[in-house]
Design a protein with these regions (language model features):
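Beta1-alpha1 glycine-rich phosphate/pyrophosphate-binding loop at the start
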Residues: 49, 58-81, 90-92, 119-127, ...
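A glycine- and small/hydrophobic-rich beta-loop-beta segment
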Residues: 332, 367-371, 375-377, 381-389, ...
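Active-site rim loops that border cofactor/substrate pockets in soluble metabolic enzymes
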Residues: 388-409
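A conserved short coil-to-beta-strand element within the FAD-binding core of flavoproteins
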Residues: 221-235, 373-385, 395-398
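ANL superfamily adenylate-forming
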Residues: 262-274
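Rossmann-like dinucleotide/flavin-binding elements
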Residues: 157-181, 221-230, 249-250, 271-355, ...
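Ferredoxin-type iron-sulfur electron-transfer modules and their immediate structural context
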Residues: 1-154, 202, 241-260, 271, ...
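Alpha-helix C-terminal capping/helix-to-coil transition sites in glycosyltransferase folds
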Residues: 236-237, 417
Length: 487
């Protein structure tokens, strides 16, 4: 290699190039010919884009390196690995996320969107690796390691969904005594009562929840804070409180100028519909179902309705009563069941819908018609007060300044016949008994460490702060646990 005697007289920044000069030149000339250049690449330590895109904060590069064999499990005194590489990778993964088998199935994987390999060919199958490691742990009965010392501090976790379970897990690892309070019969929150069971198998969900409880976490189900137990009692009995209430109250259709548009018994919310299905009350629906939404929840509703199908001559009150929680349907004869005609409308065009691309593709593959660029403008009712159709109109929707702007196209209205209309346009928090936390915007206000504003010792996370992904709720719980530990 020949070197020049050229002396670099231009002052360079620490990045080894002139500020403002971002044009890529021939690196070979600079590396091998200029005496002032470095002979090897310069590496800058920064968060990998996959990890930066993961709301749970998983050490993705870490466990992928273990799976690839780059990082080996530690050796024991006998010169053999102290554990299989699968367990080693699982333990690295669960430092942040205690529910990999569930998340490997339902997470839309924003980490894969941020993956560098997208610039070359396609992303690394991070979600599939997570799924595999979660299944391996269940099949081999892997358990979390209990803390060596206990702090003597007690923490109450309100809500047994992903945020509450994540917070309880992290707090238990830190040595705190944790009690989870949940109004339902079983823990899991939206993972159990919001996502269809065929996407989150109950045996898998139960196994991962039980592993958290095995750390010494106590669960008090069928207990609603604010009615069965007051918050004042909790503050007296516990050193800190975490609010993971979730957002399990659905939002009604936004029909302007008609307050009674959604009072028909066959116009329901997505949360009520999915809970009725997951509870086993809902066994079939009407022949024609219209779903209003565009996010992942609306895709769940549409696919469930399509799979449930309808039964000829079934009474409409059958499914209406089941969704309202008044009764359960008899098991329908499979041979008599036919697929429901399901239409999903969204104010956004299909390519701009909020649902994950693969969720949209799955829905279309199941025969669901997706109408992008249509907004609900009215509900057509019959003489009995039941809805017979949803009136929709074409529209143009865009986000401006963080707000949704929808422009209706005049003269484009039409009716979509419907036996059942489901509103899947968002969720709200039920603050019954805890009204003091309602900020008037459908949630509560917390600081960057997820401590509730003006409420020392009270922390929060998950949908109660911002209805979003399960992985976001898990991340909130972990950050709040750190705050509680410091508190």
């Amino acid at each position: 290699m020949s070197l020049t005697t050229e002396v670099q007289d231009t002052k360079l920044s620490f990045r080894r190039f002139k500020d403002g000069d971002t044009k890529v030149k021939r690196w070979q000339d600079s590396i091998f010919q200029a005496s002032w250049s470095h002979k090897c690449p310069t590496y800058i330590q920064s968060t990998p884009p996959c990890q930066g895109s993961c709301p749970s904060g998983e050490d993705i590069r870490g466990y992928l390196n273990i799976v690839r064999g780059i990082e080996k499990p530690p050796m024991g005194a006998d010169g053999k690995p102290v554990m299989p590489w699968q367990e080693y990778a699982w333990r690295r993964l669960t430092e942040a996320n205690p529910l990999p088998a569930v998340m490997g199935r339902v997470c839309p994987a924003p980490c894969e969107t941020g993956c560098n390999r997208n610039q070359v060919e396609d992303h690394v199958g991070i979600n599939s690796v997570e799924h595999f490691l979660g299944e391996y742990a269940i099949q081999n009965n892997l358990q979390f390691k209990k803390p060596e010392k206990l702090t003597g501090k007690k923490v109450a976790v309100i809500g047994g969904g992903p945020a509450g379970l994540s917070a309880a897990y992290q707090l238990a690892l830190k040595g705190h005594a944790v009690t989870i309070f949940d109004e339902h019969e079983f823990l899991g929150g939206m993972m159990r009562y919001g996502i269809p069971g065929y996407r989150t198998p109950r045996d898998v969900l139960d196994a991962e929840i039980q592993r958290i409880l095995n750390l010494g976490v106590v669960a008090r189900t069928k207990t609603r804070i604010g009615t069965d137990v007051t918050l004042a009692q909790l503050r007296e009995d516990f050193d800190a409180v975490f609010l993971g209430l979730g957002a399990q109250a659905g939002r009604s259709l936004p029909i302007e100028g008609d307050k009674n548009a959604t009072d028909a018994p066959n116009v329901v919310t997505a949360t009520a519909f999915l809970k009725a299905f997951n509870d086993g009350r809902l066994r079939h629906v009407g022949k024609r179902v219209v779903v209003v939404g565009g996010g992942d929840t609306s895709m769940d509703v549409a696919t469930v309705a399509r799979r449930l199908g309808h039964i000829t001559d079934a009474k409409p009150t059958d499914w209406e009563g089941a969704i309202a929680g008044k009764m359960a349907q008899d098991v329908a004869d499979v041979s008599a069941r036919q697929g429901a005609e399901v239409v999903l409308t969204s104010v956004f065009t299909t390519d701009k819908m909020l649902a994950s691309k693969h969720e949209i593709e799955h829905a279309q593959a199941e025969g669901i018609e997706i109408m992008g660029g249509w907004m609900p403008v009215g509900v057509v009712k019959g003489a009995d007060g039941r809805a017979t159709a949803l009136k929709v109109a074409q529209c143009e929707a865009k986000m401006a300044g963080g707000k949704l702007e929808i422009k209706q196209i005049a003269g484009s209205e039409k009716d979509l016949p419907a036996d059942l209309i489901v509103s899947a346009i968002g969720q709200a928090v039920d603050f019954t008994g805890l009204e003091e936390f309602d900020n008037g915007k459908g949630g509560l206000t917390a600081d960057r460490n997820y401590q509730v504003q003006n409420k020392p010792g009270v922390f929060a996370g998950g949908d109660v702060i911002r209805p979003h992904l399960l992985t976001t709720a898990i991340g909130h719980g972990a950050i709040a646990a750190d705050g509680i530990d410091q508190y």
